[in-house]
Amino acid sequence: MKSSELFNRAKTLMPGGVSSPVRAIKPYPFYVERAAGSHLTTVDGADLIDCCLGYGPLILGHAHPEVREAIERQLEKGWLYGTPTPLELDLAGIITGDHPAVEMVRFVSSGSEATMAAIRLARGYTGKQDIIKIEGGFHGAHDAVLVKAGSGATTLGVPDSAGVLADLTAHTRQVPYNDTEALEALLAGNDDVAAFILEPVMGNVGPVLPDDGYLADVREITAAHDVLLILDEVITGYRAGIGGAEVLYDVKPDLATFGKIIGGGLPIGAFGGRCDIMELVAPAGPVYQAGTFSGNPASLAAGYATLRHLHDHPEIYRRLDDATRAIGEAAADAGKGTFVRIGSLFKHFFRDAAPRDYREVKECDTEAFSRFWKAMLEAGIFLPPSQFETNFLSAAHTTQDIKQIAEAYGSCLFA
């Protein structure tokens, strides 16, 4: 069956015909038959260079041999036990070793679950009720953070979701990104704030980069007010380099959350931080968290193989940085909009200057982006289909892939 036929069938079986809203490309999404390296093959026979990469987890590309072999070895031994496994220690050891602020870690099944648990833990540790998030910051699809949320929520025009209780979101405050004065003012009038959760780089509407010194100032301000700092590294973890944004920007949070890359393309999440905080998590303490699939062996195997490969080949990060720089140079030569990148994350904003916060991102010309996205797809390049999502590269993207992406940029920006 062709993509259009599959989608017509899907709409009779699933809300909107998809399992996640961002996949509902108009007039219908393309369906993927297989993927390898940096390429996708659709059921319609199209071959596409993939700059979505499952929205970030696949930093080594699709079906990387070492990751595939690790999964296959684990599947031969079983894929769900309901008991601890040695693989938990392997992956936990790498994560805690790479992140100075993460002394202990708990595995869960998604990034959303990780941020949900981290917020609960912060409230349990401090005895306070309120949390602060960034306007447009996206921390998953759970109720406490579906307030002025980015990512697909902004794409669909529903940053504040129906069905979320006002009594709950009354305890979720927001400040603009890159605005320490707003943070200071909010904290000065509220002594019931448990935590400030933020993406160190706004990956779900961007990337939108922190001003020089912003994260250091945030750390100083939160510490002065006895507010826990939660770094959401679900996107930046192992994307920004070994040690993520914590190491890149030299900022030490109280708690951090992870997902995507640490599972090598299989479902996973994790939250971690200081021992005195983490030891409140059940069964060691009174903050309850549990899950049937937490620490799933197949996900742990894929994640460990991925992180081990990144450690063995640190040159991957330099090569990916060079690749996004080359694409950015082509975009600059075209002279339309603004190209922003950090490592293997990149995005073209249809506005005159790089945005500093969510409000400026929303000023982008989304119709121009839509024309650009369609032209890139016709040129054989799949980008996330929203002005409010980040593009990704992987170690599997070849020199020819990068050349093709850069050349397409030059013409497609004027679609």
UniProtKB/Swiss-Prot annotation:
Q: Where in the cell is it found?
A: Cytoplasm
- Listed GO molecular functions? glutamate-1-semialdehyde 2,1-aminomutase activity; pyridoxal phosphate binding; transaminase activity
Q: Superkingdom of this entry's organism? A: Archaea
Keywords for the protein's UniProt record, in alphabetical order: Cytoplasm, Isomerase, Porphyrin biosynthesis, Pyridoxal phosphate
What are its cofactors? Answer: pyridoxal 5'-phosphate
Q: Which residues carry this modification: N6-(pyridoxal phosphate)lysine?
A: K260
Among InterPro entries, the record links this protein to:
4pyrrol_synth_GluAld_NH2Trfase (IPR004639), Aminotrans_3 (IPR005814), Aminotrans_3_PPA_site (IPR049704), PyrdxlP-dep_Trfase (IPR015424), PyrdxlP-dep_Trfase_major (IPR015421), PyrdxlP-dep_Trfase_small (IPR015422)
List the EC numbers from the record. 5.4.3.8
> Which Gene3D superfamilies does the record match to this protein?
Aspartate Aminotransferase, domain 1, Type I PLP-dependent aspartate aminotransferase-like (Major domain)
* One Gene Ontology CC term in the entry: cytoplasm
**Pathway in which the depicted protein is active:** Porphyrin-containing compound metabolism; protoporphyrin-IX biosynthesis; 5-aminolevulinate from L-glutamyl-tRNA(Glu): step 2/2
The protein's annotated catalytic reaction(s) are: (S)-4-amino-5-oxopentanoate = 5-aminolevulinate
Listed PROSITE patterns: AA_TRANSFER_CLASS_3 (PS00600)
Q: What is its main location?
A: cytoplasm
Q: Name one GO biological process term.
A: protoporphyrinogen IX biosynthetic process
Q: Which PANTHER family match?
A: GLUTAMATE-1-SEMIALDEHYDE 2,1-AMINOMUTASE (PTHR43713), GLUTAMATE-1-SEMIALDEHYDE 2,1-AMINOMUTASE 1, CHLOROPLASTIC-RELATED (PTHR43713:SF3)
Task: Indicate the family of this protein.
Answer: Belongs to the class-III pyridoxal-phosphate-dependent aminotransferase family. HemL subfamily.
Protein name in the entry = Glutamate-1-semialdehyde 2,1-aminomutase
